[in-house]
From Swiss-Prot:
Residues 54-122 bind DNA. It is found in: Nucleus speckle; Cytoplasm; Nucleus. Interacts with CALM, EP300, HDAC3, KPNB1, ZNF208 isoform KRAB-O, PARP1, SLC9A3R2 and WT1. The interaction with EP300 modulates its DNA-binding activity. The interaction with KPNB1 is sensitive to dissociation by Ran in the GTP-bound form. Interaction with PARP1 impaired its DNA-binding activity. The lineage of its organism: Eukaryota, Metazoa, Chordata, Craniata, Vertebrata. Pfam families: HMG_box. This is Sex-determining region Y protein.
Amino acid sequence: MFGVLNSDDHRAAIQQRNILAFGRTSSELWTSNPTSNYWCETRGNGRDSGQNRVRRPMNAFMVWSRDQRRKVALENPQMQNSEISKQLGYQWKMLTEAEKWPFFEEAQRLQAMHREKYPDYKYRPRRKALPQKSDKFLPAASSTLLCRQVLVDKWYPFTYRDSCSRATHSHMEDQLSSSQPVNIANSLLQQEHHYSSTSLRGSPETLATHLSADPPFYPK
């Protein structure tokens, strides 16, 4: 009985070990894309699925800065990578054409090897993440006050002289301050229509009084 149990445990342990070993090993896949037929290695998790990116060949500056970056990083371990790049860019600009020429030759050699190894290679830049909008909106109280002032100035641009007009204006301000921003426009339209129709139904004497409230303006 113990021999049967030991054999079963041994068989299960072997299967588990094989599964783990299969997950760790990398499988070589031949890509089906005719524009990039080259061997690539992918992990057992299958995330890459044979879509490993081919790096661009280095240019002259990259060839020169490959060793220089390591040297600057060793001399200044606290310096950030962005600062190292700025310093290397400045040093590269200070070099003469004769000093740069060996690195241009090396870059041309690397580009020729790259074309020979990947004849159908096409550069495909990665898409940059869209920056988040940093528009700052006004607070609710400030935006409500601003909207109220703009709407009042738009619908009542004339000067109020009689007590009825002042009362209407103060009533409008109270409604604008207490109402929701969504219903402001509808309320103004309804009250403006009601005020206009009421004024038109008045007597000719009332209309004449309102028209003669402001003195006529004569240009000089």
